[in-house]
Amino acid sequence: MSDIAPVTNTPYIPPTPEVGLPLWLLAELTYRCPLQCPYCSNPLDFAKQGQELTTEQWFKVMQEAREMGAAQIGFSGGEPLVRQDLAELIAEARRLGFYTNLITSGIGLTKEKIIAFKEAGLDHIQISFQASDEQVNNMLAGSKKAFAQKLEMAKAVKKHGYPMVLNFVTHRHNIDRIDKIIELCLALEADFVELATCQFYGWAHLNRLGLLPTKDQLVRAEAVTNEYRVRLEAENHPCKLIFVTPDYYEERPKACMNGWGNIFLTVTPDGTALPCHGARQMPIQFPNVRDYSMQHIWYDSFGFNRFRGYDWMPEPCRSCDEKEKDFGGCRCQAFMLTGDAANADPVCSKSYHHGIITQARDESETATQTIEELAFRNDRNSRLIAKSS
């Protein structure tokens, strides 16, 4: 007999062309984190956010989301390992029938926890690294012991039968060593490697001048990655390399989250529900799971309906024949760079604000900011930012 809980309580509301199902639930369990990565996507003012949801409140979120059709859950943060109830949350997600992911720095992970999470039903662990070099990794992480811990836990994850999934955020300070990064991943017997060039939200946006690679750096890094792909394929090697470029070097925007409020739903540590993890910065009052059901949040709330469909679009998006491909791009990026979330994403060459992007590219060619000069993500800096805003 199956131990998966039936999904029957909530009346089924079929998806429409403008409102899909919330298939992917990101559970940001906490903003607490032992590391200080200067490219973290968490809000700059995370230190002033409210009290974290309780175990029971997360159970309710997962139950309601599953009843609506959510299929996959990612436990993230901050660092989700600081939550003492993580194994309980994993077990409940498994009982409900979710495919479960743990997105972690590996700091705080132990062999005992890896076993406990396996017993609870965890499907997938993704461990992030800052660099292939111990000194650079630890400098970016703000921890002298981070690299050694990550190596040990990556090996333990592999040993206990999880898919080996590694994530490296690349930027101007580590991208030139992408060959060393790939070699480290192969040595760790990684199954999947995400070489994700920094996306400029949260702390990464604050530090953009010191993080954005040059065009030449990106071209070289992608060429090296492709050389490894060819070699691995020829050897019938199982490792898959995923290279993610920053939109700052594109001429068309990404179809962010496959459309606003279409398949992706984030719940933040204090219960605020968002259509993407960067949306909290917008001047929109988003609903909280303490006050509303997930069904109301997804289908009826103003925040989730604000940029659905196409009627909200101004020019040049409104008359663009590509709007059904990219949905006008990223609303958060439009807000950060132009002050109006309804504007076309400035990444698009048709945007009236595309000059902001070309200027950023130009600035990357002459940037001299060192790692030590970056603003690191920590409570002190967050409180200073919150106080000044």
Swiss-Prot record:
Its EC number is 1.21.98.4. Transmembrane segments: none annotated. Residues 19-235 form the Radical SAM core domain. Keywords: 4Fe-4S, Iron, Iron-sulfur, Metal-binding, Oxidoreductase, PQQ biosynthesis, S-adenosyl-L-methionine. The keyword Iron-sulfur applies. GO terms for molecular function: 4 iron, 4 sulfur cluster binding; cyclase activity; iron ion binding; oxidoreductase activity; S-adenosyl-L-methionine binding. Pathway: Cofactor biosynthesis; pyrroloquinoline quinone biosynthesis. GO terms for biological process: pyrroloquinoline quinone biosynthetic process. Binds 1 [4Fe-4S] cluster. The cluster is coordinated with 3 cysteines and an exchangeable S-adenosyl-L-methionine. It is an enzyme of class 1 (oxidoreductase). [4Fe-4S] cluster binds at C33, C37, C40. SMART domains: Elp3. It catalyses: [PQQ precursor protein] + S-adenosyl-L-methionine = E-Y cross-linked-[PQQ precursor protein] + 5'-deoxyadenosine + L-methionine + H(+). Pfam families: Fer4_12, Radical_SAM, SPASM. The keyword Secreted does not apply. Its cofactor is [4Fe-4S] cluster. Belongs to the radical SAM superfamily. PqqE family. Catalyzes the cross-linking of a glutamate residue and a tyrosine residue in the PqqA protein as part of the biosynthesis of pyrroloquinoline quinone (PQQ). Interacts with PqqD. The interaction is necessary for activity of PqqE. This is PqqA peptide cyclase. It comes from Pseudomonas savastanoi pv. phaseolicola (strain 1448A / Race 6) (Pseudomonas syringae pv. phaseolicola (strain 1448A / Race 6)).
